[in-house]
Amino acid sequence: NDIRKLNNKIDNLSSRGCLSTSAVEDGWIRTSSGEYIYPKSATTGNMTYSSSDVQGKTFTENIHAHPMGGSMYPSFVDLVALSTWYDRGHINAGNYIYGVVSEFGTMVLTIAHEPTFRMFTKDVLNGEQGMAKREFKDFYDLAGGSVENIVCQFIQFLNKSESGLQVLYKPNESFGKPEWSGQWKVLDMGSSSSLNSNCNQ
């Protein structure tokens, strides 16, 4: 079962890469042929893949861990990497997940609306000239509170930026609401069953 295998790999990555401040970033790319590609180098704040390993390949999964103390959401650098891979044709929007594993839980992004996502990637790749970077900075400067609040604030950033992305989130046992524990939640901030009513603002 692919879902069980993914969950097991995420759990292993979490215990290996998220419970120490001295751990380095780690993760993998899974290709459409089922091949797993692992980083050629990594530090506590960065990891890179060999261009020859990914050349001409389509990705179905791209998962990486932020070591202890790292954020529970993708950094702007992560969003640039995601946008670059899409721009270079590595991503089939209908069959792709991008995930960040942290000590707080796992956040997975899926592409819900490709035309909107395509425009978002162009804005992200515009860097300082784009709105996405400014809106991410606004989010980052104000983010705080509980795990749920920060997840909510990140989703508000995605919505404000018209990203075309949807979020799935699974908190670690030690964080988040008890009823969430160990369960994947699809978070649609436009619905009344969202994290909390503030997410709809």
Please tell me what each predicted stretch does.
Residues N1-K5:
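Non-catalytic propeptide/linker segments at domain boundaries
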Residues N8-T21, E25-R30:
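N-terminal, Lys/Arg-enriched amphipathic/low-complexity engagement segments
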Residues V24-S33, I97-V101:
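Short beta-strand scaffold segments in enzyme catalytic cores
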Residues E35-T48:
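N-terminal carbohydrate-binding/catalytic regions of secreted carbohydrate-active enzymes
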Residues N46-E61, A65-Q201:
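Active-site-proximal loop/helix of nucleotide/amide-processing enzymes and allied scaffolds
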